[in-house]
Swiss-Prot record:
Source superkingdom: Eukaryota
Residue ranges of coiled coil: 850-1979
Biased composition regions of type Basic and acidic residues, renumbered to the chain: 1135-1150, 1968-1979
Domain (Myosin N-terminal SH3-like) ranges: 30-80
Name of one Pfam family that matches: Myosin_N
Residue intervals of the IQ domain: 792-821
Protein name in UniProt: Myosin-11
CDD domains: MYSc_Myh11
Record PROSITE patterns: IQ (PS50096), MYOSIN_MOTOR (PS51456), SH3_LIKE (PS51844)
Region described as Disordered: spans on this chain: 1130-1150, 1709-1736, 1891-1979
Amino acid sequence: MSQKPLSDDEKFLFVDKNFVNNPLAQADWSAKKLVWVPSEKHGFEAASIKEEKGDEVTVELQENGKKVTLSKDDIQKMNPPKFSKVEDMAELTCLNEASVLHNLRERYFSGLIYTYSGLFCVVINPYKQLPIYSEKIIDMYKGKKRHEMPPHIYAIADTAYRSMLQDREDQSILCTGESGAGKTENTKKVIQYLAVVASSHKGKKDTSITQGPSFSYGELEKQLLQANPILEAFGNAKTVKNDNSSRFGKFIRINFDVTGYIVGANIETYLLEKSRAIRQAKDERTFHIFYYLIAGASEQMRNDLLLEGFNNYTFLSNGHVPIPAQQDDEMFQETLEAMTIMGFTEEEQTSILRVVSSVLQLGNIVFKKERNTDQASMPDNTAAQKVCHLMGINVTDFTRSILTPRIKVGRDVVQKAQTKEQADFAIEALAKAKFERLFRWILTRVNKALDKTKRQGASFLGILDIAGFEIFEINSFEQLCINYTNEKLQQLFNHTMFILEQEEYQREGIEWNFIDFGLDLQPCIELIERPTNPPGVLALLDEECWFPKATDTSFVEKLIQEQGNHAKFQKSKQLKDKTEFCILHYAGKVTYNASAWLTKNMDPLNDNVTSLLNQSSDKFVADLWKDVDRIVGLDQMAKMTESSLPSASKTKKGMFRTVGQLYKEQLTKLMTTLRNTNPNFVRCIIPNHEKRAGKLDAHLVLEQLRCNGVLEGIRICRQGFPNRIVFQEFRQRYEILAANAIPKGFMDGKQACILMIKALELDPNLYRIGQSKIFFRTGVLAHLEEERDLKITDVIIAFQAQCRGYLARKAFAKRQQQLTAMKVIQRNCAAYLKLRNWQWWRLFTKVKPLLQVTRQEEEMQAKDEELQRTKERQQKAEAELKELEQKHTQLCEEKNLLQEKLQAETELYAEAEEMRVRLAAKKQELEEILHEMEARIEEEEERSQQLQAEKKKMQQQMLDLEEQLEEEEAARQKLQLEKVTADGKIKKMEDDILIMEDQNNKLTKERKLLEERVSDLTTNLAEEEEKAKNLTKLKNKHESMISELEVRLKKEEKSRQELEKIKRKLEGESSDLHEQIAELQAQIAELKAQLAKKEEELQAALARLEDETSQKNNALKKIRELESHISDLQEDLESEKAARNKAEKQKRDLSEELEALKTELEDTLDTTATQQELRAKREQEVTVLKRALEEETRTHEAQVQEMRQKHTQAVEELTEQLEQFKRAKANLDKTKQTLEKDNADLANEIRSLSQAKQDVEHKKKKLEVQLQDLQSKYSDGERVRTELNEKVHKLQIEVENVTSLLNEAESKNIKLTKDVATLGSQLQDTQELLQEETRQKLNVTTKLRQLEDDKNSLQEQLDEEVEAKQNLERHISTLTIQLSDSKKKLQEFTATVETMEEGKKKLQREIESLTQQFEEKAASYDKLEKTKNRLQQELDDLVVDLDNQRQLVSNLEKKQKKFDQMLAEEKNISSKYADERDRAEAEAREKETKALSLARALEEALEAKEELERTNKMLKAEMEDLVSSKDDVGKNVHELEKSKRTLEQQVEEMKTQLEELEDELQAAEDAKLRLEVNMQAMKSQFERDLQARDEQNEEKRRQLLKQLHEHETELEDERKQRALAAAAKKKLEVDVKDLESQVDSANKAREEAIKQLRKLQAQMKDYQRDLDDARAAREEIFATARENEKKAKNLEAELIQLQEDLAAAERARKQADLEKEEMAEELASANSGRTSLQDEKRRLEARIAQLEEELDEEHSNIETMSDRMRKAVQQAEQLNNELATERATAQKNENARQQLERQNKELRSKLQEMEGAVKSKFKSTIAALEAKIASLEEQLEQEAREKQAAAKTLRQKDKKLKDALLQVEDERKQAEQYKDQAEKGNLRLKQLKRQLEEAEEESQRINANRRKLQRELDEATESNDALGREVAALKSKLRRGNEPVSFAPPRRSGGRRVIENATDGGEEEIDGRDGDFNGKASE
């Protein structure tokens, strides 16, 4: 069923179930494997898992479709959509930060600011007003259990209140969170709720304000509510984070009595930030009251208080800073009203405001420094005069006490001149102290007002509202105290939630592994509050306050010295400011500025000013300063705090109490109070720092959740057993659920609980049994409470039934006694009435009193004596009473005197005791301070000794280290020198080697020449010339060869250098091209990803479209079937209607004839005037009905026209959508074919390219081998090659990435075959671009081949040069041998240096490897820790899921049992119904037989009547004879006529009663038949609905199987595609290797590639345009999909409506059964009455026989009437002629009516087509029609009443007509004729009734709306006929005025019966239709 629509205030409390139970979201979640991944913007972002590789996961972001690879530890699970906006986050299946944040964000954006997190509640500040705090909402939450209502602060308050009353344990509600998170507002809501729920004057609230001691009704609650506005005005201010920030902490203690009513309250405050009164930061305000006063004061008040404008006050640093949506003047009036309600007098209010004004005026006092001295002066004392006027002190004394105060020096008192700074400080200190004292006085006054009641408080509920955690730009002493308090509260939360909870599990012996959540805040708390070893911040601050020369800088330095190594302490990074330090709080790092901390801690005041204020003429000011106790400049308010807080415990007070110590003691006391209560935590969260509604900063919220321990609290709530109850209490409370489980007699509580739990069949995982308590998981106790409530209601109902039965029996017995007593009284009265006239009784009554006279006189004397005695006793008693009263008054006076004395003594004793305690406390405190100082001095001495010893050790260590450093430095310098010398020697030797090589070369050349010459000279001197010639030739030749070789060598080197340059250039260009290609590929990949995404979306849309088309086809089939069925029914209905119309026409004809006869008889009796009046009334009614019918027909036709138009529009839209989808499908098929062709072409091109690549690769390998030979000989070439290899490696990685992208693209390309036509055009463009690229690649390959040919030619030249080089190298090798020898020596020399350096490097490498191993191990440890945590979380979630599943299984088993029971009950009920139906059928058969027998008896009676009439005729004839013979008998004629008339009247009345009984019998039979028809129709409808539901279930099952099969086929296709992709990947890897070889050659095509790049960029723009078009198309598809979803939802709603119709039909069937039983009872009573009436009839018929003898005497009077009857016959003939003409016109109208019916039939067929679509929109019109039906029913009832009245008048007229009828002679003849006609009419009536029953049987099968509409149409069609018949009837009445009648009573009564039957039938038909319609409408 659809959810009931939520009201405006419920929208912010309840979750919309339609949003949560969205099947599309569930399907999306399950299909996409959605998870949470970290996000910088949103904290966490939704993504779907695409691929898993070991510990890494590739995910696709849902928002932008971007793919990201992350570690598994960084991913968090996502909950199913049904857990969206869950009210308790402990119910989440996957508990992690992302899920908690998402749930809070969803609820926050829906206006749901409260969320349960296990045992506590999380509140997010909405920054706007929500309508969830009204009295209606309070009533909703009052007394409700937590799980029965959504989360709310009222639920927390109610839980605490009920726990306090039930457990008798003090409760506390702790609102914690940062500043601006909403703590104060929630505190106010708690107080508001308690004031309403726990009010002791409910229903008697009085709004009057009383100032006396007596309470008005509800005054305490009103005062409790008004305390907050007063304290907020004086203690709250606007900060950067919060417009209403509490600048003090408060603990509101509300006391309750035993019955739960509020009996009083008390408020304790902590650390008012009084420095705000004199100075504020930028954009901040001081306390509200200053602005309220200036803005809201009246003119007279401004004059009295000397008020000025905002900008005229120095203490208002920023002037007037307005607060949005708040008016200061209105708030001022509210504050004054609150003060009045609290009982503040007018004088007190003005005094308070005077002090506030004086504080402002203090800031306007200006001091100046005198020229020659530092002394301060006050040149203008106007402000001082105003201050003194307001405070009631002397101006001169005030200025003297400020400028030259008197101070005590030793024993002397001297005046000391103050500097300007000191005077300013004194004024500011005075202003702060004045405001603080005023605030404390107000608090005391409020507490006094709240604690006036004399009732004793049994328990209390505390509400803590303390300033939240604060991090400002400048954080001072107040922020430290506030943050310290929040640390303590958070520690209390952690201790309560985690430590105490688990310790209790261990104490109770429950199996539990202790979990350390790592949330201990004790280190930070100890850093602040630790007294010694080492001292904390507060202790060091107090210590510094002792020293006169101490400064804030020295305090910070000492703090750094003591706590510098603390984990939670850090030095400030700003080196300039030496008064700053940092503390790492749980909520973040806070930098504190310690400026003026010593002053704030000591809080000094000017004694002269305070004494002056103490002596003020203003009583209020003097009271503020009367109890100042000042020692050594430290402000102390001991007396005031003791007197002002009577309920507070008297803490240690005395001298030298600093602000820090006082606050620490207050906080300790508060924490003790909170630990003694049962805390209820409310965690307030600030969503953003801009104070904007509807914005949530995810990281800010996450940080607060982490700090507050929300996740850990939820986890321990889920894993643990948070609900626990003592054995005895469990048994006492829940024994009712397992009544027979515990045997009688004594049994141990634990054993009893075990037996109870077994009887309750609880899952063992849901509870644990401890030593003294039984523990439950969350929700179990709530379930038990629900079952207990149900059981108690059953018991109470049974008890109430017993009580009612007992009372009924008692009342019955009393009635019986009364009845018997009444009978006795009646009997006695009857006897007395008989006796009172009896003479003996009268004598007895007279004599008996005389016998008692003597005894009465004796009794009277005895009574007089007794009366005298009682009077004497009374007088004695009165005298004694007076004496006792005198004694009592004396004793009371003595008692009062003694009480006064005792009171005075007790007061004296109390004062003395108080003084003694105070002195003792001061003494003890001074002693403690002394001991502490001595201990500190000793500790300081020990510490200093230790430090000195450590210092010596450190100095010794420093010396040792310095020596070691010097030695190492010396060794290092030696090594450096040795290294330098070695380097010099090496260089020198290298130079020597070069010189020697040159010399060696020269020497070898010279030696060769000399040897040649010597050999030539020695061998042959003769041939010297020839040899010389040959040598010269050879020399020339060699020289030419060498020169050629040198030239070639230079050329080769130049060419090599040019090649290397070209190579580098090409490499640079190739890298640029690769980058561009990578960018293009990335863009292509993004486009493909977008295409894939669009494909998926399109597939989803197509799938939805197919589902919707199938649903639409099914719906159309059903519509066609229904239409055919409706058309058949309509045809049957029309035939039945035709028959019914004919029958009605005949019926009307008969009625018209009867009416005509009646009018004729009435005309004879001169009743024409009355008839005309009746006719006029009827005509008016007819005209009114006509108008109503016409209006209804017009409205109906208009509605039909509208529905027809809407239906045609809907059909046209659906046809258009179908055509669009068909076109889209055709386009998709076309694009699929084109894509397949393109894919084939691309595959062919890739094969050709791969072949070309292989050829190029072979050539490249050959070249690389040759190049390697060359590069191995040259070191430069080796470096270049290594660089190239690195670049190649990078390119390989890039190519691998490209191939992986290509693989992905190919896998997606396979899916692209099913895509949209718009995307196909884009693909075609991209394919054209690819073809162009391939052509360009072919051009590049051809160019590469040309370059390779050039390279081959160059290579051949190179080979020749290499051979020449080899010859040269052989010569060089001899020289290299000599070089190697010298190098060996050099190596031996440098070996020693290298060994040392290698050792050093080895050590460094070992250190680096160790550090690397350590880092790797640390990283692996962190990773393992993360995985462990993640696995632990998953395990916890799985355990919780397992528990939930077990619970679900148990619940399902229980539901199965209940379902079986219900099924059995339903079977029993159906069998009962079958039995009842059989019994009803049997009864109906019996009644039919009875009716037949009665009909036979009626026929016999009629026959007897005819015989009597015949005998009557004979007797009349005899009477005539007798009359003619005997004339003297006529004297008694008149008397006989009278008696005869009376008898005939009686006979007629009996006949009418008999006829009415017959009519009732007929009506009962009709009702029986109608009920049977209804039953049959209901049964057939029910069977049809069951069959339809079975068909729907079967259809759903088939669809699910089809979907499963489709998913399996898709999975198989996916597997095949993966296999194909893997093969393609391997192939591509091979291709990539081939491509790597072509990289160098591809570099030469750079310029062409740049051109292609430009083309690609232009094409990319085109792609972008196409992409935009595709997005627009996608949006259109999404729009159509959304419309289809809406239509699907509408169809679902219609299905639900049909189910509801079925249920309503079932209810109607039950109602029909009840009506059937009632009809049966009425039929039985009618039968019994009918038998009695038949007996009476027989008796009357005998009497008639006697009277008929007397009728013969009346025939003499008949002759006079015969003439009149003849005239009437003539008039009747004329009327018959007119009737014939009217019948002809009626026939014409009948033909016109049939034509209209045909038109209506066509309209109905169209209307039935539209009914399905218009059904939901027609509810309002249905309601209007129902109202019309009700009005028509009322009209029908009125008409029925009028008919009954008319029937009565007709009966009276019938009686009058009897005299005339008796005188008519021809009555018998006409009676026989009309009797025949009546019999014919009865036969016709029976036929008509049978036809009507059949028509009703058919019509009741049609549903309610159709019946309603058909009924209106029928009425519209019958309107013309009805009008025609009305006219005919009226004419016949006018014309048949004088027609003679022979036997009118039977005919008339029969006619009336016909009319009554007709009207009854019509009414029953209308009732039946209305019942059906109402049944359907209720459905």
